[in-house]
């Protein structure tokens, strides 16, 4: 009784707290119930689908010559995607994710019944695969972008044919952006769940075990011996993308011989390069361009499809009697002469050269993701779940650069052997299929004894830098990529123990000197006085592409560059000639090039049609805009002397450790990165401070610099839009300055490719809401940093944020002129302005002679170089 009375007394005393707790529990229950209701399939809930967590990278790859790196796991939330039966002609317009338990059968909605198809019940394993791929193994001519081997949707609605399970498939469906891609994913997963997608077993025709021919050693004496029979002829398959036409020409000039054949595929997204390559091919009968084009993403199934289709084309070109198929990219370059290559292949005319991974197969299968199902659509490789390797075969793989005999290519393209047909089906849904398909077919085929474990290449692998998951935005996996060769790597190019005839990768925007060294090693030096040997130009914009490919930042910068240059032309000449040198720009620039000299970025070259202010015909000028350095190294101590440079930019490349956005052009909506280079020295901790144009301390953070650290970089999560104008980044140690740099956030004169309107300018140029770049305020540091009073700068920023039209252009030009200067102008043709030199006589101009990248007529020895 005493205890009961005590309980009642406690209840009376704390009844308010108890009531509050019960109310909170009731509210939580209602919230949970309401959120579970969101998962039900109700009409009009299109936007409530929750995305899974981003992919989590796993361990890194160490395979000898494979691009596959580490796997990423899909979103962690488990659940089901399912379709709902609708009235005829009314497909489900969306999919919903159910998180209810499996035993809650009352909430289940059965999948839409699949349409009847003749012979559907008999499709299983390889038979289903053949039905999907088609008789030829690849689809008829047409657009690409997804793998046509997948069952295609019949309409734009998304109608799952089954109840889809598995976290990988659910994650892919949640992230796919188009209904067609979602439908393809659902169809593939449903076939896979039913066991009708992958072959269960594949026949093996090779009776040998292990590696067939581990390698062939290079023998200088044997290489000089005469060849029995006619010399082999080679079909080079060049797979290119981007805009580096000059580097492609340099490669073609190095490998060209009139006895060989050259077939070039240009990525469907690279229209400028395609136009240039088509023009190039018109000069030579043995150079052709594929009449079709594909979007070939890194690691995608479309790359294998492109190779198979190209091989069939090459086999069917009349008069092209080639013996070997060699694939190259524009970043490859020969390391031995054509004569040495032909002699070597003529002595080994029955061998196929492919580089294997060099590890046990079970480890390779896991690292390469061969035990996972992938599908390509929306220019992305989606991981959809696990699968089994077909029984009965040995799976091999490694590098997707190879040298294949014509007989093996014919076997792969034309055979009706179930080995090839079923492996085509298997590799249609495989990550990096070109790195394994040809290896696996050959190692299980009757020609397995012809395999040599060497692809005749040397690749500049640096896993520490090259395996940074740099392709995770297009592949649900962490991949690796080789590094560019530099002069210090030249000894690696001189392989003496094994035959190597090509090397990769080379990029002239990163380092051209190593190409000069290699070219001299192969062919000797150019004649004395040869121009432009240290210069390199690369197009970034061409009028034929239209402005659609330009960002608003680039469009703003290029047009402002033209205005600055024309103003310079009118003021930097003798007074008497001034009226003849006043020009007005006509339209947008016609082309823009990056200009490098001696492996240093020198600026942008803008070609612009202009109208003289005086009477006269229209002219075309090229203008050179050079960036002005703003780095200040301020420290004097031993630790401070470690700092070598401090840069801010976008498009940071962790593999080559440079900014791909040369010149650092960025706008209010960009996400800049601060990078520091260090010399070796004692450990230190540095503080990085970002200051905006109105002296707002946007952010501050510390970086630890170990004794052997060479590069540090960080992208702070700043709220956008960034305030336009000159920003400052300071590097300090114990609040003593080590260095400082300035960078420009460019005021935009264009928004969505149209002149900026006032209602857009008022938010785009006003900085972040409440001047808060981060959740935490760092303004308390302004006193320590001795920043000026912000009021005058804030008032100027408010006025600038309202500008449009000519006033906005004047502001943009003024800001840009603080970071860029006009280094030169020239005329593409005769000009009324006497101070303008012809561009073809101007050493920095993009039309100046460039013999190293000019092809010219075929010489008496059948070569171009």
From Swiss-Prot:
The chain crosses the membrane at residues 16-36. It is a single-pass type II membrane protein. Residues 39-157 are annotated as: Disordered. It catalyses: UDP-alpha-D-xylose + L-seryl-[protein] = 3-O-(beta-D-xylosyl)-L-seryl-[protein] + UDP + H(+). Its main location: Golgi. Glycans are attached at residues 122, 327, 683. It is an enzyme of class 2 (transferase). Keywords: Disulfide bond, Glycoprotein, Glycosyltransferase, Golgi apparatus, Magnesium, Manganese, Membrane, Metal-binding, Secreted, Signal-anchor, Transferase, Transmembrane, Transmembrane helix. The keyword Membrane applies. It is found in: Golgi apparatus membrane; Secreted. Disulfide bonds join 162-190, 206-448, 467-480, 469-478, 581-833, 826-839. Its EC number is 2.4.2.26. GO terms for biological process: chondroitin sulfate proteoglycan biosynthetic process; heparan sulfate proteoglycan biosynthetic process; heparin proteoglycan biosynthetic process. GO terms for cellular component: extracellular space; Golgi membrane. InterPro entries: Glyco_trans_14, XYLT, XylT_C. One of its GO terms (molecular function) is protein xylosyltransferase activity. Residues 53-65 have a biased composition (Basic and acidic residues). Monomer. Belongs to the glycosyltransferase 14 family. XylT subfamily. This is Xylosyltransferase 2. It comes from Canis lupus familiaris.
């Amino acid at each position: 009784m005493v205890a009961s009375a005590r309980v009642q007394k406690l209840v009376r005393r704390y009844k308010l707290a108890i009531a509050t707790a019960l109310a909170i529990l009731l509210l939580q229950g209602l919230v949970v119930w309401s959120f579970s209701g969101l998962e039900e399939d109700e009409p009009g809930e299109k936007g409530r689908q929750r995305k899974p967590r981003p992919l989590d990278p796993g361990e890194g790859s160490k395979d000898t010559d494979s691009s596959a790196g580490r796997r990423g796991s899909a979103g962690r939330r488990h659940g089901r995607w399912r379709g709902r039966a609708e009235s005829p002609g009314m497909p489900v317009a969306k999919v919903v994710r159910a998180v209810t338990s499996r035993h809650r059968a009352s909430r289940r909605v059965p999948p839409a019944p699949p349409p009847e198809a003749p012979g559907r019940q008999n499709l299983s394993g390889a038979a289903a695969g053949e039905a999907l791929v088609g008789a030829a193994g690849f689809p008829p001519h047409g657009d690409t972008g997804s793998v046509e081997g997948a069952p295609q949707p019949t309409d734009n609605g998304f109608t799952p044919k089954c109840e889809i399970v598995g976290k990988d498939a659910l994650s892919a469906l949640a992230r796919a952006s188009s209904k067609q891609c979602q439908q393809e994913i659902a169809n593939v997963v449903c076939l896979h769940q039913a066991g009708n997608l992958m072959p269960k077993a594949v026949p093996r025709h090779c009776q040998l075990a292990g590696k067939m021919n581990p390698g062939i050693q290079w023998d200088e004496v044997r290489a000089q011996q005469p060849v029995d029979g006619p010399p082999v002829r080679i079909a080079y398959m060049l797979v290119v993308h981007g805009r580096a036409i000059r580097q492609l020409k340099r490669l073609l000039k190095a490998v060209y011989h009139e006895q060989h054949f050259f077939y070039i595929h240009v990525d469907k997204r690279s229209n400028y390069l395609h136009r240039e390559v088509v023009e190039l091919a018109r000069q030579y009968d043995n150079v052709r361009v594929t009449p079709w084009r594909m979007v070939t993403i890194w690691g995608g199934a479309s790359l294998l499809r492109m190779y198979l289709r190209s091989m069939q084309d090459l086999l069917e070109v009349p008069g092209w009697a080639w013996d070997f198929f060699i694939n190259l990219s524009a970043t490859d370059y020969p390391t031995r002469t054509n004569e040495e290559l032909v002699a070597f292949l003529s002595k080994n005319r029955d061998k196929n050269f492919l580089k294997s991974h060099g590890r046990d197969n079970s480890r390779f299968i896991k690292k390469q993701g061969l035990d996972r199902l992938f599908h390509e659509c929306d220019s992305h490789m989606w991981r959809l779940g696990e699968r089994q390797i077909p029984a009965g075969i040995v799976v091999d793989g490694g590098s997707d650069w190879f040298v294949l005999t014509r007989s093996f290519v014919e076997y792969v393209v034309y055979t009706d052997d179930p080995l090839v047909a079923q492996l085509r089906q298997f590799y249609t849904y495989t990550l990096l299929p070109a790195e394994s398909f040809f290896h696996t077919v050959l190692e299980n085929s009757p020609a397995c004894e012809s395999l040599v474990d060497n692809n005749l290449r040397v690749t500049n692998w640096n896993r520490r830098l090259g395996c940074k998951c740099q392709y995770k935005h297009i592949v649900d996996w962490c991949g690796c990529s080789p590094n560019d060769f530099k002069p210090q790597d030249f000894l690696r190019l001189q392989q003496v123990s094994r035959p190597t005839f090509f090397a990769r990768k080379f990029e002239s925007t990163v380092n051209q000197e190593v190409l000069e060294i290699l070219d001299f090693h192969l062919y000797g030096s150019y004649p004395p006085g040869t121009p432009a040997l240290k210069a390199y130009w690369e197009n970034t914009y061409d009028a034929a592409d239209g402005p659609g490919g330009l960002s608003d930042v680039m469009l703003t910068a290029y047009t402002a560059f033209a205005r600055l240059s024309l103003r310079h032309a009118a003021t930097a000449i003798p007074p008497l000639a001034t009226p003849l040198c006043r020009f007005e720009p006509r339209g947008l620039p016609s082309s823009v090039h990056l200009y490098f000299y001696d492996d240093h970025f020198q600026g942008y070259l803008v070609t612009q049609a202009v109208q003289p202010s005086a009477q006269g015909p229209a002219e075309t000028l090229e203008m050179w805009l050079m960036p002005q350095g703003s780095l200040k190294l301020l420290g004097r101590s031993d630790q401070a002397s470690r700092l070598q440079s401090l840069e801010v930019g976008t498009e940071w490349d962790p593999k080559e450790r440079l900014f791909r956005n040369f010149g650092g052009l960025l706008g209010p909506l960009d996400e800049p990165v601060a990078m520091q280079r260090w010399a070796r020295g004692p450990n230190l901790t540095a503080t990085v401070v970002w200051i905006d144009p109105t002296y707002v301390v946007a952010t501050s953070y510390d970086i630890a610099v170990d004794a052997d650290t060479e590069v540090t970089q960080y992208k702070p999560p700043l709220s956008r839009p960034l305030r336009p104008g000159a920003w400052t980044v300071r590097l300090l140690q114990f609040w003593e300055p080590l260095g400082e740099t300035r960078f420009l956030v460019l005021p935009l004169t264009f928004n969505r490719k149209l002149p900026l309107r006032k209602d857009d300018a008022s938010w785009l140029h006003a900085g972040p809401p409440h001047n808060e770049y981060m959740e935490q305020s760092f303004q308390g540091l302004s006193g320590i940093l001795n920043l000026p009073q912000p009021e005058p700068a804030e008032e100027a920023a408010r006025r600038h944020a309202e500008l449009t039209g000519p006033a906005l252009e004047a502001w943009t030009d003024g800001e840009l002129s603080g970071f860029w200067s006009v280094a030169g102008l020239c005329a593409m043709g005769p000009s009324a302005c006497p101070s303008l030199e012809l561009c073809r006589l101007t050493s920095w101009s993009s039309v100046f002679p460039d013999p190293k990248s000019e092809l010219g007529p075929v010489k008496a020895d059948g070569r171009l170089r």
